[in-house]
Structure formats: structure tokens, C-alpha cells
A protein has these predicted regions:
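Junction motif at the cytosolic side of a transmembrane helix
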Residues: 168-190
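Transmembrane helix boundary and interhelical loop/hinge segments in multi-pass membrane proteins
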Residues: 4-26, 30-31, 38
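Membrane-interfacial segments
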Residues: 15, 19, 59, 63-68, ...
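Residue-level recognition of membrane-helix boundary sites in multi-pass small-molecule transporters
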Residues: 19, 32, 106-107, 165
Length: 190
């Protein structure tokens, strides 16, 4: 939630305060402004995601002793890397939606709804309709697990997606809002 709010606030805060005009005066090429915001946000989100997992490992290591994961274990290292990439994807999705909506409340509401609310009705509907379960598996929070949790067996028959398909869908959730934001931002008045 932190990186989603940060992603939305990076641009909606400028729109609400009128600072977007100053930003566009300093960087008149809108694509470059969007790209720079996306790059800085991606670095910060990756560091927040990976850093929080590393910090929780460091705090829990003395208590768990030999039961704590090892940083040399590939599964745990992949979890750290995947958590960072997961945060990058969510932050970019929020940035794109923030550019599109230009409203802090609207962007945050939409992101939180996609991440935490949309799966609830789909989960109830999936008991009656198979398509609802498949759609639920394509939501950002569900496919993000393909990046960070390598222990999930994607070919066990309980998932209709493969791990690579889930990663591609998650990438689409991150990239499509940014591309749409670029298209709209380059043609719309500030």
C-alpha cells in the first residue's frame, strides 16, 4: 500500500498544488518528465520492497536462529528480489493511474480496490462460475506472487496460468497504465 500511495502521490500531488506547471516549465518534454518520475519511483519502490524483506530477516534472525532463511539460499534471495520487483510493478501501476486520473483520492481508491477489494466478489462468484476464479487469478495481487514466491507450484492443476504467464500479466498491469498515461499526458493540458 505504501508504494501504491507513493506512486499516486508523485503526480497527483503536483496536480493538486499546481506544481505540474512548474515541472513542465522545467522539463517541457512530457515523455521525459513521465520517464524520470517512473525511474525514480522504480528505484525507491525496489529499495523499499527488498529493504523491508531484508530488514525483517535481520530482525527475526536472532529469534529464529537456524530456522531463518539464509541469504545464500536461492529461494530466499529470489524472494527478496521478487518483493522489490513486486513493489516496482504496483508503484508504476499507481503512477500511471495517477497520471490518468489527476486525483489523489481517485488514484488511491482505484489502486486499493484493484489490490484488495476486487478479489472479494470474484472469490464468491468463483464458487458458481469458473471464469470468475480465472479472472481473480489475473488480478495484480494474485499474479505478483509469481515474482516473489518461487515455492508456488504453478503446474499443480490449481492454477490456470503458468509462472511465466503470471509474470507477463503482472508486467502488463504495471506497463499498460504507464503507456496510457504517456499517451494522455502528451496530448492533454496541464
Amino acid at each position: 500500500v505504501v508504494v501504491a500511495v507513493l506512486g499516486a502521490l508523485i503526480i497527483t500531488g503536483e496536480y493538486s498544488s499546481g506544481q505540474i506547471r512548474s515541472s513542465l516549465a522545467a522539463v517541457p518534454r512530457r515523455g521525459r518528465l513521465l520517464l524520470s518520475k517512473a525511474v525514480v519511483l522504480s528505484v525507491v519502490a525496489f529499495l523499499l520492497g527488498s529493504g523491508s524483506v531484508l530488514l525483517s530477516w535481520a530482525i527475526s534472525k536472532p529469534f529464529l536462529g537456524e530456522h531463518a532463511g539464509s541469504l545464500t539460499d536461492w529461494d530466499y534471495s529470489a524472494y527478496i528480489l521478487g518483493s522489490g520487483l513486486d513493489c516496482v510493478g504496483i508503484a508504476l501501476m499507481a503512477l500511471g493511474i495517477g497520471f490518468l486520473l489527476r486525483s489523489t483520492a481517485g488514484a488511491i481508491t482505484m489502486i486499493v480496490s484493484l489490490l484488495f477489494v476486487a478479489d472479494l466478489p470474484l472469490q464468491m462468484m468463483s464458487q458458481k462460475w469458473e471464469w470468475a476464479g480465472k479472472l481473480m487469478e489475473c488480478l495484480p495481487r494474485s499474479v505478483a506472487a509469481a515474482l516473489s514466491d518461487l515455492s508456488i507450484n504453478w503446474s499443480d492443476g490449481t492454477h490456470f496460468l503458468t509462472q511465466s504467464q503470471a509474470i507477463a500479466i503482472f508486467a502488463a498491469w504495471a506497463i499498460i497504465p504507464v503507456i496510457a498515461a504517456w499517451l494522455v499526458f502528451s496530448r492533454r493540458d496541464a
